Regions:
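Thiamine diphosphate
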Residues: 1-164, 169, ...
Length: 312
């Protein structure tokens, strides 16, 4: 997949906001002194009167966005995942989640692919934190096309939404016009020996891994599970029944994220062997994104190794 066009989903987020802003006057965007990094600066240029910079005060930003949502506006509150899910968790829980307000959170720079910024900014806990909030939708797109469709779906959804976008450029695997639905996964490649359920930048790695596994006689199914909550239970159960083995792959801690959601479902409804690929019980490090992904086992090579051992 090295020859495919690559785009960072944070860029997709900024572009999608501009397009939606042209169509909907009630869309407003908030940032916390990071408009350049979150790419909401493109919206600022297009609609300066509908962009609000709250400074380095993420908790305040969440509360202001919550207040504005009660007037009929649809706020998109944007900052790094570490600050959106970490620093402002109390405000997200109590000011958005508890009253079930129509606020969308665009969290960029999630996972260890943040790179040189290091462990303090590499949020690998956000899915887990946001999943615990009742009524919160939690999503992570695989590429540019899905990210833009996801932002549109989030706008149309009534209620709180958390979306994670990445800093690193990822291959575009979807065709234009892709029909994204909240709570629905998609099978990108059919297989019968093992099902790899991934999201975010690990989807492209899973597809590459499946190609390599096929050369060795292992037919891997690849599922893009962009919505972590609500999980597409029907698709997970169908894959478990068909393949009998599941691998989850995510740029997140193995605690609290996609892997845990899949395991919780299967343990109750269809006990199935599962291998979780993600960040183990440790913090990240500073370094180039590609090197970090390999070091933490978040690569096609490691998915291949895990699948081969699993399918023995």
């Amino acid at each position: 997949m090295s020859d495919m066009v690559k785009i960072a989903t944070r860029d997709s987020y900024g572009n999608a906001l501009v397009e939606l802003g042209k169509e909907h006057d009630n869309l407003v965007v908030f940032d916390a002194d990071l408009a350049g990094a979150t790419k909401t600066g493109t919206f600022l240029k297009a609609f300066p009167e509908r962009h609000f910079d709250c400074g380095i005060a993420e908790a305040n930003m969440i509360c202001v966005a919550a207040g504005m949502s009660t007037t009929g506006l649809v706020p998109f509150a944007s900052t790094f995942a570490m600050f959106a899910a970490g620093r402002a968790f109390e405000q997200v829980r109590n000011s958005i989640g508890y009253p079930h307000l129509n606020v969308k959170i665009g969290a960029t720079h999630g996972g260890i692919s943040v790179g040189e910024d290091g462990a303090s900014h590499q949020c690998c806990e956000d899915f887990g934190l946001m999943r615990t909030i009742p009524g919160m939708v939690v999503m992570s797109p695989a590429d540019d096309v899905e990210a833009q469709a996801m932002v549109r779906a989030a706008y149309l959804h009534e209620g709180p939404v958390y979306m994670r976008f990445g800093r690193a450029a990822v291959p575009v695997i979807h065709e234009e016009g892709f029909n994204f639905q909240i709570g629905k996964g998609e099978t990108l490649r059919e297989g019968k020996d093992v099902a790899i359920i991934a999201n975010g930048l690990l989807v492209a790695e899973a597809l590459t891994a499946a190609e390599e596994l096929a050369k060795e006689g292992i037919e891997a199914e690849v599922i893009n599970m962009a919505t972590i909550k609500p999980l597409d239970e029907e698709l997970v159960l169908a894959a478990a029944k068909k393949c009998g083995k599941i691998i989850t792959a995510e740029e997140h801690s193995v605690i609290g994220g996609l892997g845990e959601a899949v395991c919780s479902l299967l343990s109750e409804k269809l006990p199935t062997p599962v291998k979780r690929i993600g960040v183990n019980d440790e913090f990240g490090h500073s370094g180039p994104a590609g090197a970090l992904l390999k070091a933490f086992g978040l690569s096609a090579e490691n998915i291949v190794a895990v699948a081969k051992e699993f399918c023995k």
